[in-house]
Amino acid sequence: MSYSKFDLTFKIGQYLDRHLVFPLLEFLAAKETYDQSELLQAKLEILSKTNMIDYVTDIRRMLYPEEDTPEEIIQRRGVVLSELQELQDAVEPVLRLMQRDDVMKTIETMRDPKTLINHLSTNKEYEFKIEMIDSMYRLAKYRYECGNYVESASYLYFCQLVMSPTDKNYLSVLWGKLASEILVQNWDGALDDLTKLREFIDNGGAGSTASNMQALQQRTWLVHWSLFVFFNHVKGRDLIIEMFLYKPLYLNAIQTMCPHILRYLATAVIINRSRRNALKDLVKVIQQEAYTYRDPITEFIEHLYVNFDFEAARRKLNQCQAVLLTDFFLIACLEEFVENARLMIFETFCRIHQVISIGMLAENLNMQPDEAECWIVNLIRNARLDAKIDSKLGHVVMGAQPLSPYQQLVERIDSLAVRSEALTSLVERKHKARNQDIRWGAQEF
């Protein structure tokens, strides 16, 4: 099975700044998923529209080792250095201020941009002029285009402090700061910037003239940029569920513009044991969007919680592993994903069956019987499950926790509902197989 059809790199890349696309291409190159010369060509196309001239030269040498560096690239390098120096000279007083810890501490305590600008302008020692704000923004953008993301983040931070939210460049500053923090992998800073940007967009900060469609586009971009933060920050796996599943404006953006993001939402729910309560809501969304997007990860959820088809879920789990291995954002979650997916299969299986064959369970978990028995023993010990293993018969016998009459009723109803759905699904599948039109073969919808 070719997993390149499940690769979302180029789909996601449409919603990213070109600098953010570059790490994804580097990942693909390391994975050798695509032809290396095609990836080098894609890198060159991205870099040619930036000021990263030295990098452009290196990529060209790899692509065209027999050719000399074109004169226009050599000349452009000189132009970039000259323009950079000119921009730095225009804001030299501000750059000096930023080197002084005492001044920066004072600046950071002033929350009102007008008060801050007045403080900087009236103090002759600072040599600050109001037009330097726009110059600082231009310098930050230029530094960013040169690939100097640390400096860019620092300059954009200053712009955030002195700019009014109504400034024409304020929204661009927020986007630029978020991108810079992502590219230097400062995940705490990136999360702060993501929160500021989301609040700004949601509060209509993009301007009263912004249409609903423009706001939808902004949220769609933010959803994609946030993947870098959510799959790297320690709080990310909770925050992605809150934002993507429980903030209607963002769920609407995903359903309307980018249902492929359901892969990342589903993965976050699977690896987050403390958020199992989100499963029902996730299943509803996956079912609603099944006609527009599906992949092994969303299908795994469907097979397990809609169809109760454990054999199909087992097959999909195999495919899920291959998908995660080739996904820039998810590869680090692979072990957690497999462990939690197996746990979900086990839990669902146990809700339907009281006595479970270890052999059957091992088959559904893609494990050898001995390995499955050891896994179940550890699970019973760590999760404090009321279950026993009969090694002679090769069975797991589920016990019953003492419950109040009310809890017993709720559990009984819940269990009957699960069993009823499982039986209904089984009957439907058998009926479909028996009445299948041989002209069309097997059909999956």
Swiss-Prot record:
Residues annotated as domain PCI: 230-403
Indicate where this protein is primarily found. cytoplasm
Query: By its UniProt entry, which CDD domains does this protein fall under?
Result: eIF3E (cd21378)
Which key words are in the record? Cytoplasm, Initiation factor, Protein biosynthesis
A single Gene Ontology molecular function, please?
translation initiation factor activity
State the disulfide connectivity.
none
**A Gene Ontology biological process term:** formation of cytoplasmic translation initiation complex
Tell me the SMART domains matching this sequence: eIF3_N, PINT
- Self-association and partners: Component of the eukaryotic translation initiation factor 3 (eIF-3) complex.
Q: Which HAMAP family match?
A: eIF3e (MF_03004)
Instruction: Outline what the protein does.
Output: Component of the eukaryotic translation initiation factor 3 (eIF-3) complex, which is involved in protein synthesis of a specialized repertoire of mRNAs and, together with other initiation factors, stimulates binding of mRNA and methionyl-tRNAi to the 40S ribosome. The eIF-3 complex specifically targets and initiates translation of a subset of mRNAs involved in cell proliferation.
State the family it belongs to.
Answer: Belongs to the eIF-3 subunit E family.
Recorded protein name is Eukaryotic translation initiation factor 3 subunit E
The gene name reads eIF3-S6
